Amino acid sequence: MDKPAIKPQGSYISYFSNLVKQHGGINLAQGIPGFQPPSELLEALRSVINENVHQYAPGIGNHKLIEVIHKHYAKNYAVERDNFLVVQGATEALSLIYTYFNKLLGNDLCTLSFEPAYESYSQLPSIFGKRFISYPLDQDFSFSVDEFRSTITQNGVKVVFVSSPGNPYGKVWSEMEVKTLINLANELDFYLVFDAVYNDLYFDKPPYLPLNEISPNVFYVNSFSKMLCITGWRIGYLYAHQQHRAGLRTIHDYIGLCAPSVQQVALAHYLGHYSFGENFATIFRGKVRDNFNNLSVTLSKLGFYIPPTDGGCFIWAKLPKTITDGFQFASQLYSKAGVAIIPGEHFSKTHTHWVRLNIARPAQEIKQAEERITQFLSIK
């Protein structure tokens, strides 16, 4: 009998991903795209490398980049240029917003997110010593408005995080659901943080974005990391009501200062000349969708359950009935088959029998992972 693996402290994502980086294998653990960025973007980077762009960027973001972002959204939404803030990826955007909430609300800060919740949503409250509530979706992956309202009021929830498509479970929230959450935020006076990092990776219809409903209670977060396969560039942005502009910028000045200058200049050039990366995003989306379809079929044949999924770059899968411990399964899968995945308990204490697999990888790599998982289960 295999000796049970010891659970690490900290992020399971970092733990399993670092195993691959140190010892090799297939990394389906961390959300790292397995594709090169657009060639035109890399050419833009080469073209600006000798320009005077190697010092601090403006704290609010490169002005040309902000202009390109604003122009893109202004086609469909009533957005104001000055309400955008460029930051060091969506991770900084989330932590910046949460730090701002902590300053505003202090001990009254209670946060909620829907199960399974992305790690930042639960770990930020933990770092600050604040309450976090993990709210389960219904059997059909919807939510009861009355029960949700009751949870908000009874627990004094002040912040709700929602991502669309989600991570680890790729639910795309419908227009009606998003508007319901916004109406509740305005009515019950909590802050809704809408995380749209995966909004280009949808399988059917584009996700609904709440940029026409921005009020003092609604915040919007996005990033170029996944959209353009540049997770190492650390360029993201947020949009918030002008009421919060000064407060967010002040905190950003001291905990983030500015996003990388060279990358911002290159991005501004590329996005402005190549339709905001639309062609690249379309091709990338197709590859991820194909990987989802192919790997889902294989996993289903092996006894996994894959819930209806609308987008994102992950498969959220329930383990076969004979396997009940996702962490031990993930540990053995890596040690014996060299495939790194993430145990579901990292995202929800009640999902110990689930796992997350990154599908934003080359098709050949996904195929190799399928073969290794199949072989591993055949001899387990």
Where would I find each of the regions flagged by the language model?
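PLP-dependent class I/II
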Residues: 2-10, 14-48, 60, 71-380
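Glycine-rich loop-to-alpha-helix module at the N-terminal edge of alpha/beta enzyme cores
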Residues: 53, 68-71
